[in-house]
Amino acid sequence: MLDITVKHIDELERYIGAFRKGQRFFYAGKSLGLSKLGMNAIRMPKHWEHYPEHDHAADDEEELYIPLEGSGTLHAEGQTYPMHRGVLIRVGAATRRKIVPGPESMTLLMLSDRPDSK
């Protein structure tokens, strides 16, 4: 028997919690039944400034950011990195980062080595 799960991003379970209004955060990995990989998705409106600056030093979680739609900028410890479709960005656990969408809304897929990632 095939072990395949297919879902559109709009079918994923939504997270409703500490994030600020304007964004939509999805439990992608949980919705797809992933058990060995953390995966979430977020849709942010243009120029949205409320993505929290954070790191994952306490839980030693590295992240991979994959922009699906739109564009933005990753800010990390005084450096900036353009984010747009086709670009993959890995960020180590101890690096503080913040993401700001550009002049259009941005949909971002986030992968990690922790299945329980939020």
What role is predicted for each listed range?
Residues 1-38, 45-46, 118:
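A short, N-terminal "cap"/entry segment at the start of jelly-roll beta-barrel domains
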Residues 25, 41-59:
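Conserved short histidine dyad/triad with adjacent acidic residue
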Residues 33, 93-117:
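Ligand-binding loop in jelly-roll beta-barrel domains
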Residues 33-35, 75-79, 102:
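Short strand-coil-strand connectors
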Residues 40-42, 65, 109:
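Conserved hydrophobic/aromatic positions in well-ordered beta-strands
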Residues 60-73, 77:
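Glycine- and acidic-residue-biased ligand/ion/polar-headgroup-sensing regions
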Residues 78-93:
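Short acidic-glycine-tyrosine-enriched beta hairpin
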